[in-house]
Every structure is written in structure tokens, then in C-alpha cells.
């Protein structure tokens, strides 16, 4: 078994801080999900908090400390959080381009509007929810130019018991390795 998520962030931070005279940094959220048990171990490096919807409830922000951005300062130690997902739970991750989308009146889409939208659409399938959210953001911003990316990921947890249907693939750290 490899490193824990917080250890990965600690090591990544040290590497990003090396020779970083320009002061560049990045936010990140990472989780490792055990598909059989639902155990999700995660760490947050200054990223937006994910939204979690339990199978029988509504979306809530995952209560977690944001942690410090990666590449911002040497010697930072990251904390690991852990939750257990149950069948039907849904997790939504997104970049800051979602809540920071700005309309022509210079108003932000915001975390509250995002939470409201998600809770008004709890029965919508995951594959349909992201395009609907993007359409809502586009309607909100209108013709206002945007300066940040919008990246979103959503999944519903469905337990996977071990066996032949389980696949583990390892890729080299090169984008072209993902071509197939």
C-alpha cells in the first residue's frame, strides 16, 4: 500500500516549494476511496470543500479544515480526514471557478447558491446534474467574461465487493499514458 493522502500532500508541497521564486501555488483536494468498504480518506490543501449527500438526505459541505495551499510554504503538514460512504451517497467536487463565477453586476455565484441548486436537484442523476449546474452558472453569469476554469466531478457510491470485476491500473505520471 502507498502513502496516505496527507503524506502525499506533504511531499508534494515540499517539491513544489523547491525553487519556487515566483511564489506559485495550487489548491487541491484528494481522496482515496475503498470501493468495498466505502472508507474515504481525504486531505485538503486550500481547496473548496466538497459537497456530500447521504443517500437519504440533502447536500452539506463536508466539514474539513482547508489546510494550506500546495507550494505556498515549506514545512506544512497536512491532516487526513476520514468518512465512510454508504450505498447511494453522492460526493461532488469542484474548482473555485464555480462559486467565483461572476455576473455582469460583479456578484458571485457563491457557495450558498451552489448548495441551494444542488439541494433542489437531489433526485437528478449524476450524469445529468453537472450539465444542469453548468447551465445554471452560465445563465447566472450571462455575458460577463470569466477568468477561472470550472471543473466538476460527481459520483454516487456503489459498493464493489472484491473479485474479477475489480480492476487496478497504474499509470506513469505522464499525460500521454492515459490515451487508452
Predicted segments with their positions:
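Conserved subregion of the PPM/PP2C metallophosphatase catalytic domain
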Residues: 1-173, 177-179
